[in-house]
């Protein structure tokens, strides 16, 4: 799919959080199996961004070229960092923190541009969030970043304000996809109105009750597919880009196979009702 910024974004992304020493191997495997979008963050607490870069470099040495890939990383505010391992000067002004984090990401990922830079979470105040966004806009102006996004944004009012106030509007929203937020129905509606790509994480982990539901099981049985494949297929048919962080090559293959089948209209309605998408 193509974003409002004109950037091609794969319909399924490989997420690299919490992979630690296995990061490089798993990124190599994901790209070898056919993933073309990688999500990471400049946040040593949960991501090994340099090992993501090593895995990408290996793939680029086996026939892929940089334009074949969609590399998305995040600026993580100080509140989300391990204070003993912050990838920028925590005493620096916020715009400088963002600039330092961006430069670290370029080094880690061994690239000279990012396809998307995501603000990992809103800042404590709207003023700070807009200040961070303007610093990120300057990186787009300098052609180091192709588009911008925001993560962990569950407030439709905040997202709407950002869309109005930003000079470069968000192209991506990435949120946890779970029942506690009503599956982000309000946020997703705003994303549709503003032509923002909605990305979901914790899509499987947070939803065992969906995966175990008879509506999903019946579709999986009819199609000869797994419950995760059915849920992912429903989401891509409904303008959601899921992240998968599987460590299993077999599951990587299953995830990529969601493009090989379609749900029936009755199955879409039944699963949609579970997520509140249909009455």
Spans of features found by a protein language model:
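N-terminal binding-site loop/beta-alpha segment at the start of enzyme catalytic domains
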Residues: 1-69, 73, 131, 206
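Short, acidic/polar
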Residues: 19-31, 91-109, 156-160, 183
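A structural motif
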Residues: 35, 111-114, 145, 170
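Short, well-ordered amphipathic alpha-helices
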Residues: 50-60, 102-106, 136, 159-163
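Active-site groove signature of glycoside hydrolases
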Residues: 106-126
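Beta/alpha (TIM)-barrel catalytic core signal, keyed to glycine-rich beta->alpha loops juxtaposed to Asp/Glu
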Residues: 121-279
């Amino acid at each position: 799919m193509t974003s409002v910024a004109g950037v091609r974004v794969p319909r399924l992304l490989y997420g690299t959080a919490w992979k630690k020493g296995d990061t490089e191997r798993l990124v190599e495997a994901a790209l070898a199996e056919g993933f073309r979008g990688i999500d990471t963050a400049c946040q040593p607490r949960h991501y090994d961004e340099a090992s993501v870069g090593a895995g990408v470099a290996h793939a680029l040495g086996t026939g892929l070229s940089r334009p074949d890939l969609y590399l998305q990383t995040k600026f993580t505010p100080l509140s989300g960092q391990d204070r003993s391992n912050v990838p920028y000067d925590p005493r620096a002004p916020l715009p400088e923190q963002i600039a330092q984090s961006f430069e670290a990401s370029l080094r880690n990922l061994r690239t000279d541009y990012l396809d998307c830079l995501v603000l990992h979470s809103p800042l404590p105040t709207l003023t700070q969030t807009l200040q961070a966004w303007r610093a990120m806009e300057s990186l787009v102006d300098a052609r180091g970043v192709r588009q911008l996004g925001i993560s962990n944004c569950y407030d439709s009012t905040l997202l709407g304000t950002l869309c109005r106030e930003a000079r470069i509007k968000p192209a991506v929203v990435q949120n946890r996809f779970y029942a506690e937020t009503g599956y982000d129905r309000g946020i997703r509606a705003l994303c549709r109105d503003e032509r923002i790509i909605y990305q979901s994480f914790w899509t499987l982990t947070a939803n065992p009750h969906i995966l175990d539901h008879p509506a999903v099981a019946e579709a999986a049985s009819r199609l000869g597919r797994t419950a995760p494949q059915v849920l992912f297929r429903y989401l891509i048919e409904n303008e959601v880009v899921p992240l998968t962080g599987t460590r299993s090559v077999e599951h990587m293959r299953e995830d990529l196979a969601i493009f090989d089948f379609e749900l029936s209209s009755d199955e879409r309605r039944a699963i949609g009702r579970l997520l509140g998408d249909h009455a």
